[in-house]
UniProtKB/Swiss-Prot annotation:
Belongs to the ABC transporter superfamily. Transmembrane segments: none annotated. CDD domains: ABC_HisP_GlnQ. It comes from Bacillus subtilis (strain 168). ATP binds at G34, P35, S36, G37, S38, G39, K40, S41. Keywords: ATP-binding, Cell membrane, Membrane, Nucleotide-binding, Transport. Residues 2-236 form the ABC transporter domain. It is a peripheral membrane protein. Disruption phenotype: Impaired growth on arginine as the nitrogen source. It is found in: Cell membrane. Its main location: membrane. The gene is artM. This is Arginine transport ATP-binding protein ArtM.
Length: 240
């Protein structure tokens, strides 16, 4: 599904990703964890070309998306992205937020887009909020709308960039529940997260990153019970 080979990314002279290579299978759920500044979010943003790599290749479903003339908008149609700070349109209702990309990018009819949006809102438990504007929603509700909006494009892959880190603690659970339900559908998911219990419970694999490199790549149970690297041991001791 996703093949990353020797991926590198720099901002000025600062090398953020250093020759990263990994493969993610279809239907696999991969949690990306590590200390702040380790390159986790940059790695995720490279997967849908929100950041353009300086070197290496990314291949998704046999298509190398890092080729110079790649249509980035086409790539993003098939990859849903959920951000830390929601990125909802403040001047559009919940329903309009979810319908926007299917109507304007995929050219779906408004009726079809609305039916799909309403169905997704039922799934994330927010159908009754469909005509509200984002400023009327809690942080957890905004993030659930953001997940529904990403799913409205029928993506093959979902990327989550610390989806709960901007939320009050009591709102984290409702967002994680929606994500758990998505895992059960067999969606391919890459999740940058600080929620270690969630990573342990739902991930098929854990990538531990530090200083722009993947230091460990393995089974969540083994990683959390007995990390191999000193850096991972130190990290887990501080947060668990």
């Amino acid at each position: 599904m996703i093949k990353v080979e020797k991926l590198s990314k720099s901002f000025g002279k600062h090398e953020v990703l250093k020759n990263i290579s990994t493969t993610i299978a279809e239907g696999e759920v991969v949690a990306v964890i590590g200390p702040s500044g380790s390159g986790k979010s940059t790695f995720l943003r490279c997967l849908n070309l929100l950041e353009k790599p300086n070197g290496g290749t990314i291949t998704i479903k046999d298509t190398e998306i890092t080729k110079p003339k790649t249509n980035t908008l086409k790539v993003r149609e098939n990859i849903g992205m959920v951000f830390q700070h929601f990125h909802l349109f403040p001047h559009k209702t919940v329903l309009e937020n979810i319908m926007y990309a299917p109507v304007n990018v995929k050219k779906e009819s408004k009726q079809a887009a609305q039916e799909k949006a309403e169905d997704l809102l039922r799934k994330v438990g927010l159908f009754e909020k469909r005509n509200d504007y984002p400023n009327r929603l809690s942080g957890g509700q905004k993030q659930r709308v953001a997940i529904a909006r990403a799913l409205a494009m029928n993506p093959d892959i979902m990327l989550f960039d610390e989806p709960t880190s901007a939320l009050d603690p009591e709102m984290v659970k409702e967002v994680l529940q929606v994500m758990k339900e998505l895992v059960e559908t067999g969606m391919t998911m890459v999740i940058v997260t600080h929620e270690m219990g969630f990573a342990k419970e739902v991930a098929d694999r854990v990538l531990f990153m530090d200083q722009g490199m993947i230091v460990e790549d393995g089974n969540p149970k083994e990683f959390f019970m007995s990390p191999k690297s000193k850096r991972a041991q130190d990290f887990l001791e501080k947060i668990l």
